[in-house]
Amino acid sequence: MNAKIVALLIVVGFVGMFNVATAADPLCSLEPAVGLCKASIPRFASVGGKCQEFIYGGCGGNANNFQTQAECEAKCG
């Protein structure tokens, strides 16, 4: 019985740590948005907790849009 309780507490602890790590800023969980314009601008966005390059159209989109990978990582990890 005690082993089950300990295992449950460990699982809850890991889930709690994961939620804190990924909830740094709500904008980091937004899907990258290309926007409405037709430009082809390399940008970075947080996807699944990692900063990845995407092509931004130049207007519209959302706040998950960074000029450099370093800027993305500073904000979203």
UniProtKB/Swiss-Prot annotation:
Swiss-Prot/TrEMBL keywords: Disulfide bond, Protease inhibitor, Secreted, Serine protease inhibitor, Signal
Residues of the BPTI/Kunitz inhibitor domain: 28-76
Keyword set includes Disulfide bond: yes
Gene3D superfamilies the UniProt entry points to: Pancreatic trypsin inhibitor Kunitz domain (4.10.410.10)
PROSITE patterns linked to this entry: BPTI_KUNITZ_1 (PS00280), BPTI_KUNITZ_2 (PS50279)
Function description: Serine protease inhibitor.
Protein name as catalogued: Kunitz-type serine protease inhibitor cvp2
Organism: Pimpla hypochondriaca (Parasitoid wasp)
Species lineage: Eukaryota, Metazoa, Ecdysozoa, Arthropoda, Hexapoda
